[in-house]
Structures are given as structure tokens and as C-alpha cells.
Amino acid sequence: ALGFYVMDEADVECHYNQNLSSNSSWITAMDDRTKRMVLRDRNHPSVIFWSLGNECGGGSNFSTTYNTCKNLDSRFVHYEGAGSGTNYSDLGSNMYPTVSSVGGNRSGLNGKPYFICEYAHAMGQAVGNLKEYWDQIEGSTGIIGACIWDWVDQSVYDPARLVSGQKKSENGFNYWVSGYDYNSTSGINYGFQGNFLNNGIITPDRTWTGKLSEVKKVYQNVKFSDFSASAKSVNIANKYAFMPISSDNFEIAYRVMKDGRLVEEGTLASFQTIAAGSSATVTLPINTAVDKSAEYLVNIELRIKKPTNGAADWTTWAEEGYSIADAQFSLSEQNISNGTAMGTDGTMGFPVLPSYTSAGGSLQVENNTVTGTDNNGKAYSIVFDSSGKMTSWTYDGKDLINAGPDFNSYRKVDNDRGFSPSFSNSSSLSITRALAKSGNNAKMSVNGSATGCSYTIDYTFYPDGTVDMKVTFSPSETLARIGLGMQFASGFENVEFYARGPRSNYSDRKTGSYLGRFTTTVDDMVDEMIHPQTFGDHEDMRELILTNKASNVQIGIKAGGRASFSLSHYDETKWCKSGDSMWNTKLHWYDLTRYQQVYAHFDYMQRGLGNNSCGGDGCLSQYQCPSSGSYTYTLRFKPQSAESVNVVAE
């Protein structure tokens, strides 16, 4: 029932010294390791083929070790040899291919079954476009699988601190070290290789990450499709080779959410057995009446349960109720007038903000300042300088911001190794429509010019303190992100959001992150990778609520159009450097200063992660930020007392 397929590889690794495989003095050692492996493991049925080693070149020593395997056992033998092991392998194999090259080898490689022995290099913020790889693999006739490099970050605690019992910094970061904390030899990376020991989809302490969420989703062997919102039915395809999906050891569960809040949940007590390699359509007993006032979503899960009738027992490795496969679909009718969205699994639509009318309050304008009182009698004030930059925003006498909105394109991750965009977090501003009353409201427009992008912000101020920012970006070069940055005041630590989550996700790594309503803190939104880099993005933003418990003030933000967000207490300019300079530093999370203010990004688009920290694709074209055209979103801000209902203005 555990179902592991194992490639068993001999401990033969030359790496930088690949000429050893052509040196006859090494034949005995290489052959001995290979022979002992086969003799040790050949009675394990989970071993489906052998591998002669890794990155040792294509020398003739492998003729000997290949024949040793074949003389001892009949299973296939694999060897990649950094691209030069074709003559000693029953499989076609390579490392870190691009998605397009995988697509070109869907019938096999070198006339043999194709095995991708390393791909999706998972160093840092990574595992982009995994879905696109598997679209090719699952649509092939000759590809047998692929291995992510690799499972776990292999950092250790700083030995100097560990001896005195220090594992974590004052800010809660682990004192993990990487190769950069050790000296290289003769200026070459022998023995340490910088951050290359940290390629895992989980952290050194085995913490789940957004990378693992994506892998779990893309790799799941049960697929949900063809959901009918009217019939409440879904097709379930069993991609397992041998195992049936039966109500004897699984249950199908569903949860219905209205604007991210749970309104119904249930399970199918029984369903028809789905044989391996087949599919069936099931109907869910959903009772929720769907209207056009909200976004309705349904999450469907295949969960493990205690077996009956002699079925395989999956609870030997996971708790009862654990989901081995899931999907999310929209129940809403598409209606752009009220912000509902309709899409298929992984491609939900973007929200649309309805027009807004203030329910009470009063508003005054003087020079570049908006003041007023909301419908709860709380005073507010918003101040701009002569260029149109927001310099102050208060509510009930409490500061809401530390710095107003400005263009921000800072973004750097390990996979940006071959990508060196311009960075900017400030712009030249000018007022194009002076602040003035417009009926009961007030309006103001500002133009901004930053490196690689111009933009406009059209402000609408409502008497109850609600503020709309309609932002239009016009990029002129390929940037890492297109969006606004701003700083909220100290104390806005508690977070509720309606977006993809709960873990970080990106445009090309969001298949395994579903829309939902989640609660957390700004500190807990850090992705603690060993090497500091951009983190915490949440795609398909609908709503964000920040609460300052000390001042009893809450800021609600709703998005209209394409938008994502991230929050942080750390200054990204400390690690976002041009070129490959971030690859040559000892910087750790615990070296960074935690600031009291909250750095916020509201992006129209952030570049996908890709796979370029080691081979692969830098970023697929559909996930790259546009370099021309105009792109718009609207952010609707509503300050209120924290004891008020947690609903942003509709």
C-alpha cells in the first residue's frame, strides 16, 4: 500500500572529477560498490531499476559496472553521466531539461524510455511551472517519470552557537548555515558550493512549504475534472496503475464556501468503485443555494479512512481523514457586475469590485488634505504632498501608514540567477487632477514615472472613509514585478486574507494553493529559506484585513481585477541585488533587521519562479511580466474600529 517505486543508485559520484570514469585504476572500486548494491537489494520488489552513479562522465569503466548489474539481475540499468552515459543505460536520461525539450521527447529519448533523473531544482523560492512539466509527462507515451532535486534543505545549525544551546535568533529564525559559511579551496567551490546544499522542498527541520503543496497537488494520482455547477457532479479519474478507489478505504468529502467562509460540508457515504486506470462521475449532495451576491467555491477531497472488506490500509502511513487528492471549483454564475467569478480548477477568475455608495459620513477637502467623519463618528485624515505622494493617513487619531503607495519592482529569488531586471521603489510623481469634491465624494489623480514603468493612480474618497485606488500600469521593460509598495504603521500584525493560501504561492506555483480565507500574522508569513529572498506572495487576492490590536483599528482592503499581495517586516533592498551577487554572500535571515512597520506589496503581476537556479526554464513566457501595454487593478481601503464587523465595504 505504500507504493514506492525505487531507482537504486550506486554510491559512485565524481562530480567535478568526471575523468575518473576513464581511469582504469578506479574500475575495482566502482565495480565493487555497484556489485554490493545489487547483491544487497535485488530481493526488494520496490527496486524497479538500478543506476550506475551520478555525474561521473561517460568513461569506459561503466562498461564493466553495467555488465556487472546485468550479470547479477535482469532489471533495467540507468545511467545519465551528465549527458554522456547513453552507452551504459537501458533508459534515455538527462538532467534539468526545459519544458519544451521534454515535450519534444514525449515518445522517448535516444530510442529508449525517457527518465528525467533530475529536474525542478528546488533551491530557495522555487518549483515554478511544475504543472507544465507534468502536462507533457502525463501526455506522453515514452516518459516514465522525473525526480525533483531534492527532498530536504541540508543546512545544519551553526556549530559555534549550537554548543551554547542557541538554535534560534531573537526574531525566531533558525541559526542555519550554508556553504557560504565555510571557506572554499583555492577559490573554487570544491567542498562547499555555497547555497547548493539547500535544494529541498521542505526545510532542514522538515517544515511543510509552498513548494511541497505544489508537488503534492501536481503529483496526485486521482484527478478531478468536468465539474458541473448545476448538476453538482464531478468526474474522478483514477490514475493509479493497480489500486482501485473504493468506499472501503476512502471517502469523498466536500466543503462549500461563500466568499471564503465555510457554509456547508459533507461526505459521500458511498460511491461506486473506480478501478485503476478508469474514471467515474459522482454527484455531491450540495444543498447551498447559490446567488449572485458572492463567490461560491467548492473544495473536493479524497480522504483516507479505516479500511473495510480487506481493502488496503492507508492509515499505516497517514492519519484517518488525510486528503490524498483534492480540487477546487466554482459554484458561482459568472456575473461581472457583482464580482463573482467562474473558472476551473487552478484558473479561478479575477474579482470585480461593484460600484460603491457611502452609507453616511461626511467629507471635506482643503488643499491636498481630505478629512471627515465616518458613519461611526470616527475622524479620519489623508494628506498628500505637492507631488501627489500620500504622506499621512490617520483614523480615530491613529496612524495607518508609515509610507504611502509608490511603484515597487524589487524581487529576487534563487531562480532569478539568469535574470537581471531594473529595480525601483520610488518614482517621480505629479498631480494630474487636483484634489477636489465630486458630488458627495472627492477625487484626485496622480501620474508616476519609475524605472521601467509609468503609472496613474485615480483616487476616489468616500464620506465614510473608504478610499478607492484605481491603478493603471504601463511598463516599458521586462520587470520582476509590476505593482505598488507601501508601508503600514507599526502594530498592524494580525492578518486575515481571502486569496490563495495558506502558504505562499506564485503565478506559476499556485496549482496546489486554493482560494480560501486564512488568518495569520505578518511575522508568520515569512518563508524561512536559508538564503533571504522574496517571499510570501498570495495570488488571486480578493480581500485583506489588517488589525492593530493595540490601537483597536482595522484596515480592510478589497481587490478588483488581477492582484496579489505580500506582507513583511523586512527591507527587501537588503537582498534584492542586480546580477548574481545574491549568490555570493553569507546573508542569513537572522542577519536582517526586523522593522516595526509592515512592508506591503500589491502587485498586478509578479514574475513566475521558473527553474533557473540550475538548468531548466528561467520563466515560461506566459508567466513573465509584460513589457508594453496598460494593466489596471483597483484597491478599496476601509479603515474601521477593530470591534466592527470584519467586512470590507461592499
Predicted regions and their residues:
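Extended substrate-binding grooves/exosites of carbohydrate-active enzymes
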Residues: A1-N235, K239-S247, A253-E264
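A generic structural signal for short, non-catalytic loop/turn and secondary-structure boundary residues
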Residues: Y5, G85-N87, L109, G194, ...
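An acidic- and aromatic-residue-enriched active-site/binding cleft used to recognize and process polar
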Residues: D11, L52-E55, A82, P97, ...
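Solvent-exposed, well-ordered amphipathic alpha-helical segments
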Residues: S25-K35, L52, G58-K70, Y79-N87, ...
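Carbohydrate-binding surfaces of carbohydrate-active enzymes
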Residues: Q136-M390, M469, V645-N646
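Beta-strand/loop-rich accessory regions of lumenal/periplasmic or secreted enzymes
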Residues: P285-S293, T308, E333-E650
